[in-house]
């Protein structure tokens, strides 16, 4: 039986898959990951990290310099790991989110010579508690407990040239458009304007001061398209600069910031 390498696209997904393997929920020789959130920022020249790093420092308000070094190290490691691939089966884990699909597309672009060994696993293919109040469909791998991951192995999809070409055509299109935001909408990843979530942020911002984490949590939880708290926090600060939101407290720290919607 071939060895299995799992590839994930967030720290939480990497941790969950490693835990599932450790507990015998599924098999795997190695778990590697790309944690750069390619749903936002420039993607037309990812190999040249300078523009991505400039973007990180812009939106990672609390940890721009630190996160830049972490993500650079992930890129170096995953490129090194891919160069060592031989005849292992490669499982790419993702959900219906721009973050994980864009990450998967970028990694797939590096695996052209290995597509006969590549399988994709989409965790959004199962809806849990159907018909109940707590019905949910995972948007990203990290929304699942590790014990459930084994259910998806039998649903893995093999990669053929036709499917690979279609996915690479999508990736080329997104890179040409090179928008600073990509979202999952109408069952596909598409380029979007940078203020895509702004109306939703304003909708969940009260007219009296409340902690910013409350607004950010509401947006993340209610948005159809998965989005990170980092990106929404950055948009909050942009709405403060444009005077649509007032603030008090430390503008540089999400948990120390209170916000309210301006009356206009």
Which stretches of residues belong to each language-model region?
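Short, hydrophobic-biased segments on the C-terminal half of alpha helices
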Residues: 233-237
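A short, conserved structural fragment
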Residues: 240-250
């Amino acid at each position: 039986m071939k060895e299995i390498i799992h590839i994930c696209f967030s720290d939480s997904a990497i941790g969950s898959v490693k835990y599932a393997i450790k507990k015998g929920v599924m098999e795997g020789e190695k778990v590697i990951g790309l944690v750069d959130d390619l749903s936002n920022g420039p993607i037309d020249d990812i190999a040249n990290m300078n523009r991505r790093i400039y973007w990180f420092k812009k939106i990672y308000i609390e940890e721009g310099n630190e996160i830049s070094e972490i993500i650079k190290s992930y890129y170096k490691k995953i490129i090194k790991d891919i160069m060592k691939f031989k005849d292992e089966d490669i499982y790419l884990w993702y959900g219906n989110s721009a973050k994980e699909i864009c990450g998967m597309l970028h990694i797939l672009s590096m695996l052209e010579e290995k597509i006969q060994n590549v399988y994709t696993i989409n965790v959004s293919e199962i809806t849990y508690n159907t018909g109940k109040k707590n019905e949910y469909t995972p948007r990203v791998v990290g929304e699942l407990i590790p014990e459930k991951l084994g259910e998806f192995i039998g649903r893995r999809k093999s990669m053929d040239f036709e499917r690979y070409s279609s996915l690479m055509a999508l990736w080329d299109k997104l890179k040409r458009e090179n928008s600073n935001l990509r979202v999952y909408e109408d069952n596909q990843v598409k380029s979007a304007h940078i203020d895509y979530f702004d109306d939703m942020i304003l909708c969940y911002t009260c007219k009296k001061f409340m902690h910013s984490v409350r607004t950010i949590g509401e947006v993340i939880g209610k948005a159809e398209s998965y989005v990170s708290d980092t990106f929404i926090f950055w948009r909050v600060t942009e709405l403060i600069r444009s005077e649509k939101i007032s603030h008090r407290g430390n503008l540089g720290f999400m948990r120390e910031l209170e916000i309210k919607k301006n009356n206009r």
